[in-house]
Regions:
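Alpha/beta enzyme core
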Residues: 1-5, 9-149, 154-168
Length: 168
């Protein structure tokens, strides 16, 4: 591993050796499955505080298509501005989730999510894995910042290796 993603409270629990071996990405967003709207991601930490605590980068989570998309986008834009001032990279985890979104988002939705992350100031975007290799390749090729893929169907180790080889 090159980095770990943790919430701010976990920073104090990390042994000093972790800071020497891995990049620390502090996740600023949180919610629970018990919330009235579990797709709403609340900002629970500040960029400046994370920098003081030793973060190498921060991340935010935005659910596009959710009923609270507007507030999540405003929060992400403000975090991007704070990251620029602090000199910290921003990882945007942008997931299509909400009333009008299918379980497996369409290619155009993922292209929009990647573009939105770029437009709002992210340095890296994490998107849900979708469809065939050619679809994800199109998303990756269209995006001027690095794209991380999250999730995907459960497959054998061999199938996963073949998929990774195809994407690379």
């Amino acid at each position: 591993a090159d980095a770990i993603v943790v919430h701010k409270g976990r920073l104090r629990l990390l042994p000093p050796s972790v800071y020497a071996k891995l990049a620390i990405v502090v996740h600023l967003s949180a919610s629970t499955k018990y919330a009235a709207d579990p797709t709403f991601k609340y900002q629970v930490a500040e960029v400046e505080d994370c920098l003081r605590r030793g973060a190498d980068a921060v991340s935010v989570h935005v659910n596009i298509g959710s009923l609270t998309e507007d507030r999540q986008l405003q929060s992400m834009a403000a975090v991007a501005d704070a990251c620029e001032r602090a000199g910290l990279p921003l990882l945007a985890m942008v997931y299509p989730r909400g009333p009008g979104i299918k379980d497996h988002p369409e290619l155009n939705t993922l292209l929009h999510a990647a573009s939105l992350a770029v437009d709002l100031g992210a340095d890296i975007v994490k998107l849900p894995l979708h469809g065939p290799v050619t679809a994800m390749k199109r998303v990756i090729d269209s995006c001027p910042i690095p794209v991380l893929a999250a999730g995907g169907a459960q497959v054998s180790d061999h199938q996963f290796g073949a998929f990774v080889a195809d994407v690379m």
